[in-house]
């Protein structure tokens, strides 16, 4: 791909993902708190629900949600934020999860261990005759089951509380397709949309997060065989490079091509289910 064509694609993707050329943490916090509050009031909902993992994304989204419901209550509209701990058995980074909860200061915290449900589904699949190529493939499948069990738990609580599920997706994860479809990608409201990873961190700092939380190495931590595997190991590039791609900063052509490959391969994750009427190139 020529350099001008690559630059044009970068601009188009940044626009599609709503990455602004400018950023002010205080202004962005105000916009996003107001958005969540307006959504709840307009929809007649009374709760926000979000799983708090101990990472910076869920911590930041959770704090924004808590501030949104506090704003609503101050105006006379009753709403609450429910933080959920959703470990798979014992959590390796338990101390980080506790630090995150201290920052978020949720109205309520519920803990649901997804291990029994996830393991039961894996066993049921085996009993039904599903075989795997190897242990690594089985572990990959189990990882996605974990993410989807967490989604089930959050929607169960949201249904019981007349609430909405908050998602943690932002532009840097979205462009790479780094989320489980109908797992952590399953949500109603995305208060971090349009932000690069460095901007999520800047927003968290402005909201009062401490540096160990802000700078924690991002990990989905879904793989039992490779616990706490950093996201960047899966990408083969860094979040700094992904952010540079989205913010239009100078970068190596090969790195930009890597981002474009991930973007193209994961297009289906960012779309509603396809029909023959909207799949590119298919005669309807």
UniProtKB/Swiss-Prot annotation:
Where on this chain does deamido-NAD(+) bind? Answer: 148, 181, 188, 268-269
Identify the metabolic or biological route this protein is part of. Answer: Cofactor biosynthesis; NAD(+) biosynthesis; NAD(+) from deamido-NAD(+) (ammonia route): step 1/1
Q: Which reactions is this enzyme annotated as catalysing?
A: deamido-NAD(+) + NH4(+) + ATP = AMP + diphosphate + NAD(+) + H(+)
UniProt-annotated binding residues for Mg(2+): 57, 173
Which residues constitute the signal peptide according to the record?
none
Q: Identify the Pfam families for this entry.
A: NAD_synthase (PF02540)
One Gene Ontology term, aspect cellular component: cytoplasm
> Which keywords accompany this UniProt record?
ATP-binding, Ligase, Magnesium, Metal-binding, NAD, Nucleotide-binding
Molecular function terms from GO: ATP binding; glutaminase activity; metal ion binding; NAD+ synthase (glutamine-hydrolyzing) activity; NAD+ synthase activity
Q: List, alphabetically, the Gene3D superfamilies matched.
A: HUPs (3.40.50.620)
Provide the E.C. number(s) assigned to this enzyme.
Answer: 6.3.1.5
Q: Does the keyword Metal-binding apply?
A: yes
Top EC category = ligase
Where does this protein hold ATP? 51-58, 168, 197, 219
**Which example biological process does GO assign this protein?**
NAD biosynthetic process
CDD domains with a match to the protein in the record: NAD_synthase
Q: Family, per the entry?
A: Belongs to the NAD synthetase family.
Assembly description: Homodimer.
HAMAP family this protein is in?
NadE_ammonia_dep (MF_00193)
Fetch the NCBIfam families from UniProt: nadE, PRK00768.1
Q: What does this protein do?
A: Catalyzes the ATP-dependent amidation of deamido-NAD to form NAD. Uses ammonia as a nitrogen source.
Q: What is this protein called?
A: NH(3)-dependent NAD(+) synthetase
Q: What is the lineage of its organism?
A: Bacteria, Pseudomonadati, Pseudomonadota, Betaproteobacteria, Burkholderiales
Gene behind the chain? nadE
